[in-house]
């Protein structure tokens, strides 16, 4: 177990230090995990989340068709016409991303909203880095709001046998949706404060962008609808969402070819698929698979349980804040999967309702990824988009938004859940 922890920690230090080489560092570390036997060859495919990888590939290609149609430019014009200055343009985009992310996967949300943000920044001639970071962290926050917003929410809903409406009203009380929205309200104020110096007025638009093709927009909206519908299908294949995104990209490419009559025109959307972002995620999945196989996550869960002792409030507090810390560095899906049965056992031993512990786990694990640029797939995707546009995201750029945003969101949720379900 110790070698796995050392390799994992060293890899993260290198990725934070040499941000331009993150994909190569992560892939190299993943290969080392395999070669040393810490991740057996037979477990490699199981460690890779093909659903996320296919979603990113499919949505990236589809979004390129969306961009080429000029629809993001038109949406940018609409947003710019409604807000007074750059500050509120950034806040409104983050809030809009959050609303979408409550029903659609976080990564897909970032890929869909980022083109609109980039277009606004081009028109305003301002740096898009904080805009995209704001969109990414807002997407991560709202993933816990509904049953369909994030994989961890689906896992928790399954463990507690919760319906879609149970996320709004549970055990005769307002449920976790309102904890998330309370955090969203305060974190929006944090974003407004972070962007407080961006008071430049929005210039009056002298012309309105003309959309060249509405089919990519229909396909993108269709993607959202199908992803929502798929979330209600019981026992569906793990790669369902990824296949939906890739299938709609295929439809878009076929339509594009039928429209232009040139196969070469199909290359643009395919070239837009960011292989470096996908490579980074592959490396991270292999690393996480390695530490999971070596028992690191199980040991971390056991330590949390021991640290909580027999006091429900102490246990709740430890679970929330340790989940924030752990999820800042490792994918929250294997962590949550490990902690769900641990919490069930603890609740049985203590003879208490496990609801506050489960809700604390979900809120902490979901928001923890916002603390670091590589703590969540949505963050990695957003940074990848910026890199392709020629922008470098320093760790400090992310920390100054991600960390205060996380604490502004988690503190009210922490208090809310305990007051309603712990006392």
Language-model features and meaning:
Residues 73-75, 108-119, 132-133, 145-162, ...:
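Re-entrant/interfacial helical elements at transmembrane boundaries that shape
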Residues 13-20, 96-105, 136-148, 321-335, ...:
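Transmembrane alpha-helix interface/packing and boundary motifs in multi-pass membrane proteins
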Residues 23, 51, 88, 129, ...:
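Residues that define the loop-to-transmembrane-helix transition and helix capping
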Residues 1-67, 74, 172-302, 400-423:
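Hydrophobic transmembrane alpha-helices of multi-pass small-molecule transporters
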Residues 42-129, 280-350:
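Membrane-embedded alpha-helical segments and adjacent helix-loop junctions characteristic
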Residues 120-217, 353, 380-415, 423:
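Membrane-core helix-loop-helix motifs of multi-pass transport proteins
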Residues 1-7, 39-42, 83, 115-132, ...:
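Hydrophobic alpha-helical transmembrane segments
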Residues 6, 28-31, 50, 59, ...:
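Hydrophobic residues within alpha-helical transmembrane segments
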